[in-house]
């Protein structure tokens, strides 16, 4: 769960909130013409911030369109819009006209990929995500994401798209099935004919050691960015994600401890995560600049 904190954010928190409000209220600027889009892409390539913002704002309707695909999954619409907006920003910033793909097509894929990768198996019936090492699946296909150290296990292998040297997964929505996948879903039978579920396959003698190693690695990442938060934000994030190596708490539990409302805890959590997202993105951008300079 800690890994999800590090979805790269390509925009400052204030701007992201502003963009999300656009989508929530369906207040979309008109799409750019081909000539306008080309002009702004050329200006953005030269470092023009206004051009970048224009490209993002005038493609916000793509976020609303993609989010509708996930409206029956039980996920919070505001969360999906926020994640989709991050995907749009990544798409705009990484787009290359020389690859022959239209900006809208590329951005739409990035939006859907961001939602699927961030939400994982709980959101899409064709994907199950496990943040665990050493898993062997005998029934089904799997893909190992080396960046986030997690496995993606598919009931049927979806198409893969390669963009900017990163493997991005574009999963076609299943029209007939829109229910969550449970770890207790049957995936086959053992030699005696007994039904085997996913949770049975994942059990191993070393799972406690494996989980501890992974958690410690992720905690080291979090420690790099948690100091930018104020005391209240730290308290909420530590409790919610179990960063003190204790049980993760619900927003309701934290609200009771702090004597505030659950909705206020939710706002604090989102604000804190956005701060961490932005700091992570800034740090990664600096790393890329240094790498290019070598």
UniProtKB/Swiss-Prot annotation:
UniProt cross-references to InterPro entries, sorted A to Z: Cro/C1-type_HTH, RNA_pol_sigma-70_dom, RNA_pol_sigma70, RNA_pol_sigma70_r2, RNA_pol_sigma70_r4, RNA_pol_sigma_r2, RNA_pol_sigma_r3/r4-like, Sigma-70_Factor
GO molecular function terms attached to this record: DNA binding; sigma factor activity
Record-level GO BP terms: DNA-templated transcription initiation; sporulation resulting in formation of a cellular spore
Propeptide regions on this chain: 1-20
Protein name: RNA polymerase sigma-K factor
The keyword DNA-binding is annotated on this UniProt entry: yes
Listed Pfam families: Sigma70_r2, Sigma70_r4
Residue ranges, annotated region (Encoded by spoIIIC): 157-294
Keywords of the record: DNA-binding, Sigma factor, Sporulation, Transcription, Transcription regulation
DNA-binding span(s): 251-270
Function text: Sigma factors are initiation factors that promote the attachment of RNA polymerase to specific initiation sites and are then released. This sigma factor is responsible for the expression of sporulation specific genes in the mother cell.
Domain of life of the source: Bacteria
């Amino acid at each position: 769960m800690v890994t999800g904190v590090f979805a790269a954010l390509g925009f400052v928190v204030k701007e992201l909130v502003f963009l999300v409000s656009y989508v929530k209220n369906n207040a979309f600027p008109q799409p750019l013409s081909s000539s306008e889009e080309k002009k702004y892409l050329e200006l953005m390539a030269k470092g023009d911030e206004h051009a970048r913002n224009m490209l993002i704002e005038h493609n916000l309707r793509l976020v609303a369109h993609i989010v509708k695909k996930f409206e029956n999954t039980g996920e919070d619409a505001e969360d999906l819009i926020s994640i989709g907006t991050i995907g749009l920003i990544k798409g705009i910033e990484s787009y290359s006209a020389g690859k022959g793909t239209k900006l809208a097509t590329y951005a739409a894929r990035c939006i859907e990929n961001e939602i699927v990768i961030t939400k994982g198996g709980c959101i899409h019936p064709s994907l199950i995500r496990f943040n665990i090492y050493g898993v062997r699946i005998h029934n089904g296909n799997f893909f190992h994401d080396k960046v986030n150290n997690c496995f993606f296990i598919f009931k049927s292998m979806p198409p893969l798209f390669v963009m900017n040297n990163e493997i991005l997964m574009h999963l076609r929505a299943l029209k007939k099935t829109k229910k969550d996948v449970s770890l207790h879903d049957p995936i086959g039978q053992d030699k005696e004919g007994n039904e085997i579920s996913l949770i049975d396959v994942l059990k191993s003698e070393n799972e406690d050691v494996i989980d501890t190693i992974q958690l410690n690695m992720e905690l080291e990442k979090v420690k790099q960015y948690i100091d930018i938060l104020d005391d209240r934000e730290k308290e909420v994030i530590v409790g919610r994600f179990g960063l003190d190596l204790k049980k993760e708490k619900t927003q309701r539990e934290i609200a009771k401890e702090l004597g505030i409302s659950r909705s206020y805890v939710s706002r604090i959590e989102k604000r804190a995560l956005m701060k961490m997202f932005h700091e992570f993105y800034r740090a990664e951008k600096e790393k890329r600049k240094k790498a290019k300079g070598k």
